């Protein structure tokens, strides 16, 4: 199961959160899902020239406005001089959606271990006729140096302009796909080359999540159990609840 399913969707609600965070019911849901995709496509196309390095876009909705959180490697390219670029983008999205749009830009601390950015970097190199093997190996080395515990990259298509399409992959470290507490970042990117489209899939293992929280919960439960045992022992010895009841003498008629 873990070998086939999307690692992000497999962990939703456990260690991963949704990128669209809002609630609605009725036929409006389909319209809003479609609008979220339109927003993401527009932001990616609009900021492609700036090379901001967008890792992900999180959309939150209220009744009056839409809040968009953009996680980027170069936030300065999105904000622009004195915030001009981000204000223009906010106004454009307001016209498209018909609601007030607020944009927050959050910096990605380690872009070398973000699966989306790794995939886009490899796609850019393939489109500029760089050897796919060199691009994949360089990306893996950079990610491992940046602190990743495991990286796997797979390219499929007419690699190197070959007549017959094939798939090749490189892996370093470990990628636990079945472990739900394993923080595995996944992305799929398409490179449009002269020979045709090449699909790029990236898995990055960043370590386990919730291990410390689970240990803390177990410790708290053990302490509570010990306290309960201590209380029950104290009651049995001291307050007479645990002692045998004495029989009262029968009344004489």
Swiss-Prot record:
<feature type="compositionally biased region" description="Basic residues">
    <location>
        <begin position="243"/>
        <end position="253"/>
    </location>
</feature>
<feature type="domain" description="KH type-2">
    <location>
        <begin position="39"/>
        <end position="109"/>
    </location>
</feature>
<feature type="compositionally biased region" description="Basic and acidic residues">
    <location>
        <begin position="221"/>
        <end position="242"/>
    </location>
</feature>
<comment type="similarity">
    <text>Belongs to the universal ribosomal protein uS3 family.</text>
</comment>
<protein>
    <recommendedName>
        <fullName>Small ribosomal subunit protein uS3</fullName>
    </recommendedName>
</protein>
<keyword id="KW-0694">RNA-binding</keyword>
<dbReference type="InterPro" id="IPR004087">
    <property type="entry name" value="KH_dom"/>
</dbReference>
<dbReference type="GO" id="GO:0022627">
    <property type="term" value="C:cytosolic small ribosomal subunit"/>
</dbReference>
<keyword id="KW-0687">Ribonucleoprotein</keyword>
<dbReference type="InterPro" id="IPR004044">
    <property type="entry name" value="KH_dom_type_2"/>
</dbReference>
<dbReference type="InterPro" id="IPR018280">
    <property type="entry name" value="Ribosomal_uS3_CS"/>
</dbReference>
<comment type="subunit">
    <text>Part of the 30S ribosomal subunit. Forms a tight complex with proteins S10 and S14.</text>
</comment>
<dbReference type="InterPro" id="IPR009019">
    <property type="entry name" value="KH_sf_prok-type"/>
</dbReference>
<dbReference type="InterPro" id="IPR036419">
    <property type="entry name" value="Ribosomal_S3_C_sf"/>
</dbReference>
<keyword id="KW-0699">rRNA-binding</keyword>
<dbReference type="Pfam" id="PF07650">
    <property type="entry name" value="KH_2"/>
</dbReference>
<dbReference type="GO" id="GO:0006412">
    <property type="term" value="P:translation"/>
</dbReference>
<keyword id="KW-0689">Ribosomal protein</keyword>
<dbReference type="InterPro" id="IPR005704">
    <property type="entry name" value="Ribosomal_uS3_bac-typ"/>
</dbReference>
<dbReference type="InterPro" id="IPR015946">
    <property type="entry name" value="KH_dom-like_a/b"/>
</dbReference>
<dbReference type="Pfam" id="PF00189">
    <property type="entry name" value="Ribosomal_S3_C"/>
</dbReference>
<dbReference type="GO" id="GO:0003735">
    <property type="term" value="F:structural constituent of ribosome"/>
</dbReference>
<comment type="function">
    <text>Binds the lower part of the 30S subunit head. Binds mRNA in the 70S ribosome, positioning it for translation.</text>
</comment>
<dbReference type="GO" id="GO:0019843">
    <property type="term" value="F:rRNA binding"/>
</dbReference>
<feature type="region of interest" description="Disordered">
    <location>
        <begin position="221"/>
        <end position="253"/>
    </location>
</feature>
<dbReference type="InterPro" id="IPR001351">
    <property type="entry name" value="Ribosomal_uS3_C"/>
</dbReference>
<dbReference type="GO" id="GO:0003729">
    <property type="term" value="F:mRNA binding"/>
</dbReference>
């Amino acid at each position: 199961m873990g070998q086939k399913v999307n690692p992000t969707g497999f962990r939703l609600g456990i260690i991963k959160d949704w990128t669209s965070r809002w609630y609605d019911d009725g036929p409006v849901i389909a319209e809003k899902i479609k609008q979220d995709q339109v927003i993401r496509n527009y932001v990616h196309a609009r900021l492609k020239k700036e090379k901001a390095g967008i890792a992900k876009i999180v959309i939150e909705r209220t009744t009056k406005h839409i809040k968009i959180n953009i996680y980027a490697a170069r936030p300065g390219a999105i904000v622009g001089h004195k915030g001009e670029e981000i204000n223009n983008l906010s106004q454009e999205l307001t016209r498209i959606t018909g609601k007030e749009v607020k944009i927050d830009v959050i910096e990605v601390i380690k872009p070398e271990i973000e699966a989306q950015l790794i995939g886009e970097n490899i796609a850019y190199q393939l489109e500029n006729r760089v050897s796919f093997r060199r691009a994949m190996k360089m990306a893996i080395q950079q990610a491992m140096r940046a602190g990743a515990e495991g990286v796997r990259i797979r390219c499929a298509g007419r690699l190197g302009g070959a007549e017959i399409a094939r798939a090749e992959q490189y892996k370093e470290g470990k990628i636990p796909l079945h472990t739900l507490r394993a923080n595995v970042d996944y992305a799929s990117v398409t490179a449009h080359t002269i020979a045709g489209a090449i699909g790029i899939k990236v898995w990055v293992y960043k370590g386990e999540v919730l291990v410390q929280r689970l240990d803390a919960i177990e410790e708290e439960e053990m302490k509570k159990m010990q306290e309960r045992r201590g209380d029950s022992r104290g009651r049995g010895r001291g307050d007479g609840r645990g002692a045998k009841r004495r029989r009262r003498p029968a009344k004489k008629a």
